[in-house]
Every structure is written in structure tokens, then in C-alpha cells.
């Protein structure tokens, strides 16, 4: 019977379970046979229902024995043991931490159906019964479905470890802990599978061996091992028993040696035997599953410290202080300690290895020093569980000896050299020395202490070669990730606040606190500070000079001057090497606060601080010079359009005399030290003295004291911008200080409304007033000669002499903003001279005075009967425009458009197209008509049409103009009211094919004959400005028909 039982038992032996420490010893301790021992141990191990009589050894035959896993009952214990070993082996063989005790199982939990359920006598071979309610089924799938009706049954079990679950997804998640795969296959190994596993529709029969777990589990840490040998080897880690205690005695005893005496002898002298082939290897290395580099599970357990209950527990502070820069110091550098501390640690290490103690998994086996840290105090003899507690305790002894020592702030971490015990000297110094060096680099030596220069020593005087970092606070023992945070924390104990606000008395221990204070309370002042900080990266000298010059604004300037003797107190050569950087940014940086009225105030404010008295003289002197010079240049650029009488001194108090004295001061400084003059000049050239925002320092506000203000001559209005003053004078005083500029603006407004004239073929040109204007009246001192003689002088100019009149115009037609400040004189003389000049240059013109509107019709019609058939007949326009003879058709047709686009100044004489004598006659008649009406206004009307004529038809180099040296009164007139020399103004009465048609009123007497084809003609009944505007618009409208008209 016994052989039959052993033959049917699972292949996995129960020796580990029977011989292990988890065996529950029975009261019967006499040696028995195997079957009796098995049965007795099974009786002891398999618990029964929680009743007192069940706890007593059952006597066969008196009461039935119930199985704890199912509802079957047995009369003999042997049968019960066989049943448990056969049917419930996975649950039985699991460790105590995973086994389910019988007391906690409900009756429904006992009904567990296996793959091969026992065939009872009352069940047929092809039927399956429910062990909970006894219902039978033909198919195992139906039994599994039926089992789900019993809610409390643990239907799903793990075939690896034996744990059972009520829900399938619990089992699925559990299976991932074993192999990382889904637990779907575990259903096949339950009792009464719903659908057996098939391969190509072939049902796979599961052997009984697959039910058992192929892994061994450690009862302490729960780690799995593939075989029993590896599990036993692993247990040595927990029990701290080496192989010498179990196997070495057995292996050494046959050799006849003295193993015990030899080991004692070696331990006495702290010697280690030569590596034994069996015992030389560490137990940890004998377990490949525990190698963190082999399995992830072992690494995870090793890093979390759950593999073994080590003698030395990893310190939480050291775990938290793993910094990228400091944490690897202990692992990267080997410790080479000397002295008694090293000897003691080596002795302890050898003792441990001689006994075969396995080191902690969390420590690197390559570093023997990781286990050398003592755990007892050598001064008072107290023992501690961890090294960290010993470190905290050692401070008690250090504080007792700190009476006459330095203050804790003299070192970053507060440690004093030579105050630790021999056992703690090496570790404490390791953790402290590098702290100083790294603290200086991380914290930037903010405390101003000579960090990193101390070398801690042991009591024996030996220097520590290996320096590691400790981030423990010497006052409260807290650990920190880096020395930066340790230094900040130490300030809470020492009360040090190195970060001081430069605007108030606030001081902070951290940079972030100061930054928050500045943003909350001094946000306005932060603009200048941010600009200075921005310049720090570009040039350190720039920052020094800016802070030196900004002495009166901030308190930070005082701190700077205390340590800036090398900047301002240096020789001139060194000063000027650093100062030009200020000159480039003097307008953009807040060198002088707005409160400084002049440079004298700057000296006075700078002298208020005693620290600034020595440094005051060199820098502000040159800044004073630069300020004056910049004021002069800015005033010259911004007020160039104003007259000398309107120039007012800047509000900063520097008068014209002071501005003139500045070159002398510059020469004085240059003579004092001429070595830096070239460097200053080279830095002055790219100075940006414009009023606009500076690009190099946009965040710096421009000091208003450096910008000269402009005062209105009519009131007390002041402004920094000429444009604002001009708008103020126009709106408030109805006056424009720049007459020529005003005329130019109006001309641009009227003449440029429609863009470039079509005759220019898209080539846009500026107004003629900005290029060609007649020369002053000095070119024609006396114009009272007879008209024929004047005509005889001016008519013959050929192609080479044509620039005479154009050259005369050039000076007056210069840009108006350059002539705006010139005083105008001799108004009447210029008017008369201009009228005579126009009469001589253009003999056929007839100028009608603008005020005498009643004479205009007469002057318009008088020249007509004089020579109606003459092609050179001249007549005056209603607005006083000068009319010129039109060319014949033969000379007009070939040039065509070239007359307007590509005319040269040499063709001015030939433009009239008629002989000179003929033109003289007509001019005499035309001028005789206009002579009686000569008055002051006549001088105005000539330039009225000067601009429009020049813009619309002629290029700048093609025009022949009268002298434009006119009194200032005409400047109030718009340039569009001034007509250019109207070379083509008058056409022949019969010349309908002229290049221009002009819209003339139908009721005008001369609209059909004389004025036909004439260039813009104004109306008699309209004012000058309105008529001129309409004339210009008519001309623009008819200009598109020029090429066609010339051909007809």
C-alpha cells in the first residue's frame, strides 16, 4: 500500500517541507518509519476544523477526519494524508506566509475541483460533481459554470505559487508577478476546465506534474529560486551562517586537519586564508538570481533593501542626497585611510569575512570601505544601530570642545578640524572636506569665506586623501541634496543675510527672496538694474563704469565705490580704457538722474557720500564734458531749421557760453593726458545722438537732462521735439516758424496727390523747389535796361549757355529746411527786381498783379489784337501766369513725349520755336500792357506757378526759371500757387495741335482763339488758389492726350 502511495505521489519531493524550519513538531518525537513520520507530520500540519477535540490527535475509528481543502471525510489519517498530498499539494506545500489556515476558510472555499478529480464510488467515470452542493455534470465546462454560482469559492488558483482568487482578473494580474505574462493559461490548470487546451484542435492532456510549482520561495523575503540548493544558499544571507558551519566541517574532517584551530589562529592575527575554492566566493555571488545586473527583480529588491535584513541599514539621508555632481564621489574614488581608524576598520572587515558574513546587497562589493563605518562612539562607548546615529551623537562631544574654537560660520558645514574621535575622523572628514570645495563652486563663495582651503586632519595628524561630500547641517543634522542648499540652511542658524536690497534696508538669505522683494516693492527701479545686468555679460568694464557714474541714484553705488578704487583711482590710461564704454551708452543709460539739473548738481550729489569723495573727480569731469558735447550736437541736429534768434539754452542750465567753453575743457583734459585721446575719438564716432530710442540699450530710459528743450517764442510752452513745437505754433498761434518748409509741405500735398505725371513715364521726381531755384537777386543787380537789349543778352544762349538760368535757380531751390533760418530783407526791392528780371528773361510775358483783379481781363485780352497771327504772341493768364509762344507743328511733332521727359537744359533757347526779333516785338507789346499795373504783388505771382509748372511738365534740369530771391511774405503762399517758367503756356491761335489742351470756361473771350491749347488756364472770377487748383487738375486730366494731340 505504501509503494502504491509513493508511486502515485507527485514527482516533487516533500523533503524541503518536512526538513525545513517551518515543520510543526509533533508531541511524538520517537523515531518512526517513513510512512509513520509522514502520516504523523501530515496529521500535525494539516489543520482541521477549529474545535478542541480536533486539536487532539485523532484516534482512528472514533470520528471522521475532514479535509481542510474540500468536503471529503476520511476515517483513517493515512487516507487523509494521501488525499491532501495528491489533490491539494500546491496549497499544502506553500510557505506559511501564503497558506490559508483552516479557520479562515468557509465551507464553500473547501470545494476546489482539480484537473483530475478523484473518482468516487458514487460517481460514474464520465460524470463530474460539484463538491459544494453535490450536483453532477457530464462536462467539466458545466461544472465550472456551476461553480460560479458559489460566490465565495476561490475558483482561480495560481499554479506557480498556489494562491487562489475569486475572480479571473485577480489571477491574471497575479501571474504578471511571476513571468510578466497574462494569466489566461492558469484557467486551464483549474479543476474542470471549460475548454481544454488544444493545439490544432488536438486536446492536450495536462500531466499532474504541471500542477506543482517549479520554483522555491524564500519564507523571509518572498524571493523565488529555481531549485532547493539555491534557496538554501540564499537562506544563509538571512541566518548569517556561512558554509563553514554546515559543510566545511564535513569537508575538512576527513582531511585530518585542524579546521577550528586554524581559523582561530588566522582570526587572532587578523589574517585571511587564501581564497578557498568553495568558501572564497561570497554567498551573494553564488546566487545569480540576486545579482542586480542579472535580473530586474533582484535589482529592485536590492535597491529597496528588501532582500536581506542587513546589519547596516542604508541611511535615508544618504539616499536623498544623491546629487549628480557629488553622490558618485564615494563610488568613483577609493578610500585610502591611514592611522588607527583604518586599522580598526580593516580588522573588523577581516573578522566579518573570516566568519563568512555576507555583505549587504545595497553596498558595492568593490568598496570594502562601505562597511568600515563604525557604529560605536570611542569617547563614551555608546553603541548605535547605524552610522548616521553615531554621526549625530558625535556632535555632542564636538560642541563640548568648541568653547575656544572658531565660530561655526567660519566653515560652510560648521565642522571643526581635529575634533572627531579616531573612529569617526576619517568618515567625518571625508564628508566635510569636499563640502567646502564644492560649496565654493556651487554657492559661488557667497559668504566671502576662504572655502576649500582647509584640510581636515585626524587626531593622529594624517591628512585625508579621499575627500567626499557631506551635506549635513552641523546644528540640526539635516541632510541636503547639495552644498548650495546646505549653505542657505546654515544661514538660518547663523542669521547671515548676504543679499541686500540696493533700494532699501531689506536683506535676505537667499537670492530668490531678494528677487521677489525687488519685483514686489521696487519694480519701477528694476528697469535700470535689469539694463545694467544685461550689460554685464557684454563687458564687465561697462558695468563698472555705469555703476560708477550712477552714484547718486542707488545705494548699490556705495558698495561699488568702496571696491572700485581700481576703476576710478587708477592711472588715466587705465581709466580711459574702461570709460569709453560709458560714452557709447551715455544717452541710453541712466548715468545722470533726471533730478540733476546740471553737471554741478552731479558733483554735489556724488559728493554727499564719503565713499565717493575720492572717486568723484575723474569720472564726472569727463561725463560733464560729454554731456555738454552731446547737448550741443543734439541741439544742432534737432534745431537746424530754426533761426539763431529762436535758439534757446537747454533747461539744464548750460548756456551758450558754457557750450562754447566745452571745447576748451576738452583741450585741457587732452593736454593733461594725451594718451587716451585717440581711443576717445574712435569711440565718439559711432555715438548715436538721435532723440529716438537707442537700439543698443532699449530698456534704459533716456535722461531728459541730456536733451535740450525747445521753447515757443510766443509763449512759455516747452518741448523736446521740434515736431511738437511746430504743431503747437500752428494750432495755438496760427504761425509756422518754417515758411519754406510750410510751402514745401503744401506743394507736396497738392502736387503729389495724383502721383507721377504720365509724361514722366513712371519716373517720379521730387518737387522742383527742392532741386532748382533761382539764385539770389545779386545775379541781376540792375534790371532797368530796355527790353530789347535785355532780350538780346539773354536770348542767344546756346546749348552750352543754357545752364545760366538753371544755375541761377539752383541756390534758391535748395531744400527748404536748410534755408528756413535765413532772415529775409529788402522785400520791396526784391519784388521790383523780380518783376524786371522776369520781363527781361521772358520778353513776351505779361505779368498781371494779383491784387488788381479788375485789370486781369484787360491784360488778358490786350496782347491778342497786337499780333493775332504771330506765333510768338504772348499774353498773360488771368492769375498772372506768364504765357510763352508755342512751337510750330513741325518742331513739336518729332520730339513728342521726349520734350517732357528727356529735354536737356541746352534747348531752352530753341523751345520758343520763333526767331528772336519776332519774339522781341511781341514781348514789347505784351509787357507794355503789364507795365502800368506793376506793384508789389506782381513779384508774388511769378513764383506762384513756378512749382506746378515745373512738376507737371518739365524735369528739374530742363526748366528755365526767373530768379526766386523773394521776400519772406511769399513764403506763406503755397508752392502750388507758384508757377514755373511757362515755356509752353501760350499756343498759337491756330496751333490746335499743341501738346496740351486746357479747359477754359466757355464764356471766356479767349477760349476759342488765343487760349486754345494753352497749358492750365485759371478762371477770371475765381481766386488765385482756387483757380490754380483747377488749372492743375485740368492739366493732369488732359496730360494723357499729349501724344495723340501732337500727331494730329
UniProtKB/Swiss-Prot annotation:
Phosphothreonine sites (modified residues): 322, 648
Sample GO molecular function, one term: DNA-binding transcription factor activity, RNA polymerase II-specific
Keywords linked to the UniProt accession: DNA-binding, Isopeptide bond, Metal-binding, Nucleus, Phosphoprotein, Repeat, Repressor, Transcription, Transcription regulation, Ubl conjugation, Zinc, Zinc-finger
Pfam families membership: zf-C2H2 (PF00096)
Polar residues bias: start-end ranges: 244-254, 807-848, 869-880
Gene Ontology CC, one term: nucleus
ZnF (C2H2-type) residues: 65-88, 128-150, 156-178, 216-238, 375-397, 471-493, 499-521
Organism superkingdom: Eukaryota
Basic and acidic residues composition bias: residue spans: 346-356, 363-375, 852-861
Chief site of localization: nucleus
SUPFAM superfamilies, per the entry: beta-beta-alpha zinc fingers (SSF57667)
Gene3D superfamilies: Classic Zinc Finger
Region (Disordered): 242-262, 315-375, 395-457, 644-670, 772-883
Cross-link Glycyl lysine isopeptide (Lys-Gly) (interchain with G-Cter in SUMO2) per UniProt, renumbered positions: 819
Location relative to the cell: Nucleus
Sequence ranges of Acidic residues compositional bias: 440-449
GO annotation (BP), single: negative regulation of transcription by RNA polymerase II
Modified residues (Phosphoserine): 106, 321, 407, 593, 662, 795
Family designation: Belongs to the krueppel C2H2-type zinc-finger protein family.
Subunit (UniProt): Component of a histone deacetylase complex that contains HDAC2, KDM1A, CTBP1 and ZNF217. May be a component of a BHC histone deacetylase complex that contains HDAC1, HDAC2, HMG20B/BRAF35, KDM1A, RCOR1/CoREST, PHF21A/BHC80, ZMYM2, ZNF217, ZMYM3, GSE1 and GTF2I. Interacts with CTBP1 and CTBP2.
Biological role: Binds to the promoters of target genes and functions as repressor. Promotes cell proliferation and antagonizes cell death. Promotes phosphorylation of AKT1 at 'Ser-473'.
Protein name: Zinc finger protein 217
Organism: Homo sapiens
Amino acid at each position: 500500500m505504501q509503494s502504491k502511495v509513493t508511486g502515485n505521489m507527485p514527482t516533487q519531493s516533500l523533503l524541503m517541507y518536512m526538513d525545513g524550519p517551518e515543520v510543526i513538531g509533533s508531541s511524538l518525537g520517537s523515531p518512526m518509519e517513513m510512512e509513520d513520520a509522514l502520516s504523523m507530520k501530515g496529521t500535525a500540519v494539516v489543520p482541521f476544523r477549529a474545535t478542541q477535540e480536533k486539536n487532539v490527535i485523532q484516534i482512528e475509528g472514533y470520528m471522521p477526519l475532514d479535509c481542510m481543502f474540500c468536503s471529503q471525510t476520511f476515517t483513517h489519517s493515512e487516507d487523509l494524508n494521501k488525499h491532501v498530498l495528491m489533490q491539494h499539494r500546491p496549497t499544502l506545500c506553500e510557505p506559511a506566509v501564503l497558506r490559508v489556515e483552516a479557520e479562515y476558510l468557509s465551507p464553500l472555499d473547501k470545494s476546489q475541483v482539480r484537473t483530475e478529480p478523484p473518482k468516487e464510488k458514487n460517481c460514474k467515470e464520465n460524470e463530474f460533481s460539484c463538491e459544494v452542493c453535490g450536483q453532477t455534470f457530464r462536462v467539466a465546462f458545466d461544472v465550472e459554470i456551476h461553480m460560479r454560482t458559489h460566490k465565495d469559492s476561490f475558483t482561480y488558483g495560481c499554479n506557480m505559487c498556489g494562491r487562489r482568487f475569486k475572480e479571473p482578473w485577480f489571477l491574471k494580474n497575479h501571474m504578471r508577478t511571476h513571468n510578466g505574462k497574462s494569466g489566461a493559461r492558469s484557467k486551464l490548470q483549474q479543476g474542470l476546465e471549460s475548454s481544454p487546451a488544444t493545439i490544432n484542435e488536438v486536446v492536450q492532456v495536462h500531466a499532474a506534474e504541471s500542477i506543482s510549482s517549479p520554483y522555491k520561495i524564500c519564507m523571509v523575503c518572498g524571493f523565488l529560486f529555481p531549485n532547493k540548493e539555491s534557496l538554501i544558499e540564499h537562506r544563509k544571507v538571512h541566518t548569517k551562517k556561512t558554509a563553514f558551519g554546515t559543510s566545511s566541517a564535513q569537508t575538512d574532517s576527513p582531511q585530518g586537519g585542524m579546521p577550528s584551530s586554524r581559523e582561530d589562529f588566522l582570526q587572532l592575527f587578523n589574517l585571511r586564508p587564501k581564497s578557498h575554492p568553495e568558501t572564497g566566493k561570497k554567498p551573494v555571488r553564488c546566487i545569480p538570481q540576486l545579482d542586480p545586473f542579472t535580473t530586474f527583480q533582484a535589482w529592485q529588491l536590492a535597491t529597496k533593501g528588501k532582500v536581506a535584513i542587513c546589519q547596516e541599514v542604508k541611511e535615508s539621508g544618504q539616499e536623498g542626497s544623491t546629487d549628480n555632481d557629488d553622490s558618485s564621489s564615494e563610488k568613483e574614488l577609493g578610500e585610502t585611510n591611514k592611522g588607527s581608524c583604518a586599522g580598526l576598520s580593516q580588522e573588523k572587515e577581516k573578522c566579518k569575512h573570516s566568519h563568512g558574513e555576507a555583505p549587504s546587497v545595497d553596498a558595492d562589493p568593490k568598496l570594502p570601505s562601505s562597511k568600515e563605518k563604525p557604529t560605536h562612539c570611542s569617547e563614551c562607548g555608546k553603541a548605535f544601530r547605524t552610522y548616521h546615529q553615531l554621526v549625530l551623537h558625535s556632535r555632542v562631544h564636538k560642541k563640548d570642545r568648541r568653547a575656544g574654537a572658531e565660530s561655526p560660520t567660519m566653515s560652510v558645514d560648521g565642522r571643526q578640524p581635529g575634533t572627531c574621535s579616531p573612529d569617526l575622523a576619517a568618515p567625518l572628514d571625508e564628508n566635510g572636506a569636499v563640502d567646502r570645495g564644492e560649496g565654493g563652486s556651487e554657492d559661488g563663495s557667497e559668504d566671502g569665506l576662504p572655502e576649500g582651503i582647509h584640510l581636515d586632519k585626524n587626531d593622529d595628524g594624517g591628512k585625508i586623501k579621499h575627500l567626499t561630500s557631506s551635506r549635513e547641517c552641523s546644528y540640526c543634522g539635516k541632510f541636503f541634496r547639495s552644498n548650495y542648499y546646505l549653505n542657505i540652511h546654515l544661514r538660518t542658524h547663523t542669521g547671515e543675510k548676504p543679499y541686500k536690497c540696493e533700494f532699501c534696508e531689506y536683506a535676505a538669505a537667499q537670492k530668490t527672496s531678494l528677487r521677489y522683494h525687488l519685483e514686489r516693492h521696487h519694480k519701477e527701479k528694476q528697469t535700470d538694474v535689469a539694463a545694467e545686468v544685461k550689460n554685464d555679460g557684454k563687458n564687465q568694464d561697462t558695468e563698472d563704469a555705469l555703476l560708477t557714474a550712477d552714484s547718486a541714484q542707488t545705494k548699490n553705488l556705495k558698495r561699488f565705490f568702496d571696491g572700485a578704487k581700481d576703476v576710478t583711482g587708477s592711472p588715466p590710461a587705465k581709466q580711459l580704457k574702461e570709460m569709453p564704454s560709458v560714452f557709447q551708452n551715455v544717452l541710453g543709460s541712466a548715468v545722470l538722474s533726471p533730478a540733476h539739473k546740471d553737471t554741478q548738481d552731479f558733483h554735489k550729489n556724488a559728493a554727499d557720500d564719503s565713499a565717493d569723495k575720492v572717486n568723484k573727480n575723474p569720472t564726472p569731469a569727463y561725463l560733464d564734458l560729454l554731456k555738454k558735447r552731446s547737448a550741443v550736437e543734439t541741439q544742432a541736429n534737432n534745431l537746424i531749421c530754426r533761426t539763431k534768434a529762436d535758439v534757446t539754452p537747454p533747461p539744464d542750465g548750460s548756456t551758450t557760453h558754457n557750450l562754447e567753453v566745452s571745447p576748451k575743457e576738452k583741450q585741457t583734459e587732452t593736454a593733461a593726458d594725451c594718451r587716451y585721446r585717440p581711443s576717445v575719438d574712435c569711440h565718439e564716432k559711432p555715438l548715436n545722438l538721435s532723440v529716438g530710442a537707442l537700439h543698443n540699450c532699449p530698456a534704459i530710459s533716456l535722461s531728459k537732462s541730456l536733451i535740450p528743450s525747445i521753447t515757443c517764442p510766443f509763449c512759455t510752452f516747452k518741448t523736446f521735439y521740434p515736431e511738437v513745437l511746430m504743431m503747437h505754433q500752428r494750432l495755438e498761434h496760427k504761425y509756422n516758424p518754417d515758411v519754406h518748409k510750410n510751402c514745401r509741405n503744401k506743394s507736396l500735398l497738392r502736387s503729389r496727390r495724383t502721383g507721377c505725371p504720365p509724361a514722366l513715364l513712371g519716373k517720379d521726381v521730387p518737387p522742383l523747389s527742392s532741386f532748382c531755384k533761382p539764385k539770389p537777386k545779386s545775379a541781376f543787380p540792375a534790371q532797368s535796361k530796355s527790353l530789347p537789349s535785355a532780350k538780346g543778352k539773354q536770348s542767344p544762349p546756346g546749348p552750352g549757355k543754357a545752364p545760366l538760368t538753371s544755375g541761377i535757380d539752383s541756390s534758391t531751390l535748395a531744400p527748404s529746411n536748410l534755408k528756413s533760418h535765413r532772415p529775409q530783407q529788402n522785400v520791396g526791392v526784391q519784388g521790383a527786381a523780380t518783376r524786371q528780371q522776369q520781363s527781361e528773361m521772358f520778353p513776351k510775358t505779361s505779368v498781371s498783379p494779383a491784387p488788381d483783379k479788375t485789370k486781369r481781363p484787360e491784360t488778358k485780352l490786350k496782347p491778342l489784337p497786337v499780333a493775332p497771327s504771330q506765333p510768338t504772341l504772348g499774353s498773360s493768364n488771368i492769375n498772372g501766369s506768364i504765357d510763352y509762344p508755342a512751337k510750330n507743328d513741325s518742331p513739336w511733332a518729332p520730339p513728342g513725349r521726349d520734350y517732357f521727359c528727356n529735354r536737356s537744359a541746352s534747348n531752352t533757347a530753341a523751345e520758343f520755336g520763333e526767331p528772336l526779333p519776332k519774339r522781341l516785338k511781341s514781348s514789347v507789346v505784351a509787357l507794355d500792357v503789364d507795365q502800368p499795373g506793376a506793384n508789389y504783388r506782381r513779384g508774388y505771382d511769378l513764383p506762384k506757378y513756378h512749382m506746378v509748372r515745373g512738376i507737371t511738365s518739365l524735369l528739374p534740369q530742363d526748366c528755365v526759371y526767373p530768379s526766386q530771391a523773394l521776400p519772406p511774405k511769399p513764403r506763406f503762399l503755397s508752392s502750388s500757387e507758384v508757377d514755373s517758367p511757362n515755356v509752353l503756356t501760350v499756343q498759337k491761335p491756330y496751333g490746335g495741335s499743341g501738346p496740351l489742351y486746357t479747359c477754359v470756361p466757355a464764356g471766356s473771350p479767349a477760349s476759342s482763339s488765343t487760349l486754345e491749347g494753352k497749358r492750365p488756364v485759371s478762371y477770371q472770377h475765381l481766386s488765385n488758389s482756387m483757380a490754380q487748383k483747377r488749372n492743375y487738375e485740368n492739366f493732369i486730366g488732359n496730360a494723357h492726350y499729349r501724344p495723340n494731340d501732337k500727331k494730329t
